Amino acid sequence: MSEFDPNPPRRNFYGRRHGKTLRQSQKGYLSEDLGSLRPRGITVQENPERKPVAPSTIFGDDRPVWLEVGFGGGEHMVHMAARYPEIGIIGCEPFINGVAMLLGKIRAAGVENVSVHPGDARDLMDVLPDASIDKAFLNYPDPWPKARHHRRRFVTPEHLIPLARVMKPGAEFRVATDIPDYVRQTLEEVPQAGFDLVAEGPQAWEDWPSTRYEQKALREGRVPHYVTFRRRS
């Protein structure tokens, strides 16, 4: 098992880890850039005792820290990092093609306030201290459309309870999706995990960049939906 294997045997993971063959440039990003951007002590192999990993050890100071779960191709994460250079942003993504795409965007944009965990967000949340995250994002997550797979969605207690634990009281949690049933489940499950609904509807946030997933939804006639929660005090 390699040092970067994000699939610990203690936990099920659903979904793809690899897609189409990576370009040589993307392979270069992974071999040259990921090592310096990857937070240490997240995987079970590196941290079997699951000792806490403070965000200040990741970014080297006590700046506010945001978390993006499943950053896809990285458009949103890099946009936010460039717009808010005083913030540290940790992104989690187990799909290696998405990680490679993000690394290319990071290199092109020259942003330095990012950290990339190429694995399951649950492994990161396992070791983050209580109330250590100032804002979190879940943008166009895997919809798992079949009813028997709905419990694999991120908006379930298995994911939301750990997320609530690591978020500061009053911290904002944003969800973007174009799947009506995902909106339904989000509105049902997230408040039960300790969040209050702030806003929901088709109007995007002021600092939202249009992503390739959003553009695909619009081309195919689906209406994007944006939901904002706040961590209950």
UniProtKB/Swiss-Prot annotation:
The gene is trmB. Keywords: Methyltransferase, S-adenosyl-L-methionine, Transferase, tRNA processing. S-adenosyl-L-methionine binds at residues 68, 93, 120, 142. GO terms for cellular component: tRNA methyltransferase complex. InterPro entries: SAM-dependent_MTases_sf (IPR029063), tRNA_(Gua-N-7)_MeTrfase_Trmb (IPR003358), tRNA_methyltr_TrmB_bact (IPR055361). The active site is at 142. One of its GO terms (molecular function) is tRNA (guanine(46)-N7)-methyltransferase activity. Belongs to the class I-like SAM-binding methyltransferase superfamily. TrmB family. Pathway: tRNA modification; N(7)-methylguanine-tRNA biosynthesis. Pfam families: Methyltransf_4. PROSITE patterns: SAM_MT_TRMB. The keyword S-adenosyl-L-methionine applies. This is tRNA (guanine-N(7)-)-methyltransferase. Catalyzes the formation of N(7)-methylguanine at position 46 (m7G46) in tRNA. Its EC number is 2.1.1.33. Residues 1-36 are annotated as: Disordered. Substrate binds at residues 146, 178, 211-214. It catalyses: guanosine(46) in tRNA + S-adenosyl-L-methionine = N(7)-methylguanosine(46) in tRNA + S-adenosyl-L-homocysteine.
